[in-house]
């Protein structure tokens, strides 16, 4: 357990390092430490460490995939993407990012890496592991009952706290998820700096996933660093205030669920609201004429 904690902590630091390499920023040591501290005090980080989740171990893999894509090393990009998906299948969402860029080589290498990972895992640990995953893990993900639990902070969690009827949950959740997904796809097709689009994919993933647990929101490290550095460089004080508010909403946690009768669904969806705000701030950059 101690080894896993140390590995996760080192992966957290490495994630920031790769992020600054992607952004091509030589950050001062003090600024780097402040970012680390802000990550450590947030609840998603503490939740990840406490639950023994591999979120921080996987994050550098998806970041390295983009870093090598950025540096035209497509084979390595595809391999790291495949490794990330092998650890967290939900990161298959990023295959869409590269497909929209028509990066067929990255797509092919990622699929090859996934195939090799499946064969290696099945050969070493037996195929019953995949049978269990398909029969016991996947089916509950398609069931929308219990999605209103506080720790679920995606679109479906938010909708489930408002709508009791399972059928309506599915409809409203699908409509909102489609809206977020289409917005992300349309903006990713534009010939802009791909960093903006890559950042948007992180945010969209957490909104669309039907089970976005609070510990998953550590993956917002890249969008938060990217937007904060962009707003600082542009001296966008108002946007920095909104970004800070977004961070506070995402980082907060109620140890005791408050008994709030008025707009309780809003209070209990603070991470979702903070992520939506982050989504809007990221989109706002697409409409800046000088970017």
Indicate where each model-derived feature is located.
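Residue-level detector of transmembrane insertion/anchoring sites
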Residues: 45, 78, 93, 270-274
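A cytosolic-side transmembrane-helix exit/cap motif
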Residues: 55, 78-82, 128-135, 218-225, ...
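Primarily membrane-embedded glycan-assembly and transfer machineries that use lipid-linked glycans
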Residues: 1-76, 101-217, 221
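Alpha-helical transmembrane segments of multi-pass membrane proteins
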Residues: 43, 205-206, 225, 247-251
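Transmembrane helices and adjacent periplasmic/lumenal helix-loop junctions
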Residues: 81-98, 209-216
